UniProtKB/Swiss-Prot annotation:
Entry-linked InterPro entries: AKR_Detox_Biosynth, NADP_OxRdtase_dom, NADP_OxRdtase_dom_sf
Molecular functions per Gene Ontology: aryl-alcohol dehydrogenase (NADP+) activity
Biological processes, Gene Ontology terms: aldehyde metabolic process
UniProt xrefs under Pfam families: Aldo_ket_red (PF00248)
Similarity-based family: Belongs to the aldo/keto reductase family. Aldo/keto reductase 2 subfamily.
Domain of life according to the entry: Eukaryota
Protein's recorded name: Putative aryl-alcohol dehydrogenase AAD3
EC number: 1.1.1.-
Keywords assigned: Oxidoreductase
Length: 363
């Protein structure tokens, strides 16, 4: 029988308010969707259902309650397995489920004819996606529904009105958005708050110590609207590996799997991995991924990194990041390895005012 998350002494069990506009309480780490892969083992981590359930059990027993999915991930297997796990453990009221809509694998299953409306930000795509997600997740409601990305075709009014209807119906509780330009999210939230609609409460996007584009417009936008941030790729898609770990992988014939296929680390990834390993040693651990997670958590409040631990031991290492507090010198050192240009106009007239308001670590 699975234990109770609320009894856990782990820091993962110290639940926090999601954001200023969403008072739901969630764990400080999100168990990411890639972890449940079985259908797309050609380029992602392969995992059968039993192993996926063991991973979910470990996350919950350690105190975690925040789980991420998407309507199309792993040929829809992600939502199906999460739904089966929640039902088998009778945990629906304890788990916060986040899922996404815009793209559906039905487009590819059904062929190219008469399938255009399976994708996009429009009302029909949203209706079909949520209908199917509720069925696969075996639930009556979705805690957080993300717009997966902006399709550059639908109007802001159409998709914000359509999302608000789902909230009114009780099928969705909170709204999120991912991988979408800051100007679109700003316009959408302005429209929502101006006309009595439900605004976005959380933003999910790519961010890590090596790729810091998130800091240009996304973080300031989230601050302005009181949104939470859920960065993905925090661990560099598995490419932040110490020299020792890479040697062990080569010895075992393991490559680095990612969306671009198996390959070696780039020079920048090697440099940042060595820097992470150096800081890890200072904090009494060998885990570079724990330091990578601790780095993004140190930048601001209301950050909920998504972790993709394919193995239980990896997940446990990731959870240890919650006990690591990086010093200002640690952060300064990591950010010096691969310099980041915040870009115009932030590196021109407004840089000094941003530094004064938020501090150098947050600019």
């Amino acid at each position: 029988m699975i234990g109770s998350a609320s009894d856990s002494s782990s820091k993962l069990g110290r639940l926090r308010f999601l954001s200023e506009t969403a008072a739901i309480k969630v764990s400080p780490l999100i168990l990411g969707e890639v972890s449940y892969d079985g259908a797309r083992s050609d380029f992602l981590k392969s995992m059968n259902k039993n192993r996926a359930f063991e991973l979910l059990d470990t996350f919950y027993e350690a105190g975690g309650n925040f789980i991420d999915a998407a309507n199309n991930c792993q040929n829809e297997q992600s939502e199906e397995w999460i739904g089966e796990w929640i039902q088998s453990r009778r945990l629906r009221d304890q788990i916060v489920i986040a899922t996404k809509f815009i793209k559906s694998d039905k487009k590819y299953k059904a062929g190219e004819s008469n399938t255009a409306n399976y994708c996009g930000n429009h009302k029909r795509s949203l209706h079909v996606s949520v209908r199917d997600s509720l069925r696969k997740l075996q639930t009556d409601w979705i805690d957080i529904l993300y717009v997966h990305w902006w399709d550059y075709m639908s109007s802001i009014e159409e998709f914000m009105d359509s999302l608000h209807i789902l909230v009114q119906q009780g099928k969705v509780l909170y709204l999120g958005v991912s991988d979408t330009p800051a100007w679109v999210v700003s316009a959408a939230n302005y429209y929502a708050t101006s006309y009595g609609k439900t605004p976005f409460s959380i933003y999910q996007g790519k961010w890590n110590v090596l790729n810091r584009d998130f800091e240009r417009d996304i973080i300031p936008m989230a601050r302005h609207f009181g949104m939470a941030l859920a960065p993905w790729d925090v661990m560099g898609g598995g490419r932040f590996q110490s020299k020792k770990a890479m040697e062990e992988r080569r010895k075992n014939g393991e490559g680095i799997r990612s969306f671009v296929g198996a390959s070696e680390q780039t020079d920048a990834e090697i440099k940042i991995s060595e820097a992470l390993a150096k800081i890890a040693e200072e904090h009494g651990t060998e885990s570079v991924t724990a330091i990578a997670i601790a780095y993004v958590r140190s930048k601001a409040k209301n950050f909920f990194p998504s972790v993709e631990g394919g193995k239980i031991e990896d997940l446990k290492e990731n959870i240890k990041a919650l006990s690591i507090d990086l010093t200002p010198d640690n952060i300064k050192y990591l950010e010096s390895i691969v310099p980041f240009d915040i870009g115009f106009p932030n590196n021109f007239i407004v840089l000094n005012s941003l530094t004064q308001k938020y501090g150098t670590n947050n600019v």
